[in-house]
């Protein structure tokens, strides 16, 4: 019984915390994202998705150890970039 009461209090506290810390005017945030995406459709050069990091290694080049991330353009390294 005590455990059930503690769980109910914890859920109510977390729900209240979420409501209190929620970002105000979230509709403006979505509207700004829509406007930014619309601008990128009209001007593809403005899109950050089209940019490529030239510091990465092309496929086949030695990258070192097994890791996922930066040295290879694909993001996969198993002694040579995939």
From Swiss-Prot:
Which superkingdom heads the taxonomic lineage of this protein's source?
Answer: Eukaryota
Alphabetically ordered keywords of this record: Calcium channel impairing toxin, Disulfide bond, Ion channel impairing toxin, Knottin, Neurotoxin, Presynaptic neurotoxin, Secreted, Signal, Toxin, Voltage-gated calcium channel impairing toxin
Expressing tissues: Expressed by the venom duct.
Q: Which range is the signal sequence, renumbered to this chain?
A: 1-22
Q: Which GO terms describe its molecular function?
A: calcium channel regulator activity; ion channel inhibitor activity; toxin activity
Taken from the record, one Pfam family name reads Conotoxin
Q: Which cysteines are joined by disulfide bonds?
A: 56-73, 63-77, 72-81
Q: Mind telling me which InterPro entries this protein's record contains? A: Conotoxin, Conotoxin_omega-typ_CS
Localization, UniProt? Secreted
Q: Which residues form the propeptide?
A: 23-52
Q: Has keyword Transport?
A: no
User: What are the GO cellular component annotations?
Assistant: extracellular region; host cell presynaptic membrane
Q: Assign the protein's first listed, main location to one coarse class.
A: secreted
Aminoacyl-tRNA synthetase as UniProt keyword: no
The free-text domain note is:
The presence of a 'disulfide through disulfide knot' structurally defines this protein as a knottin.
Q: Which family does it belong to?
A: Belongs to the conotoxin O1 superfamily.
Q: What does this protein do?
A: Omega-conotoxins act at presynaptic membranes, they bind and block voltage-gated calcium channels (Cav). Acts on high voltage-activated (HVA) calcium currents in molluscan neurons.
Question: What protein name applies here?
Answer: Omega-conotoxin PnVIB
Species in which this protein is naturally found: Conus pennaceus (Feathered cone)
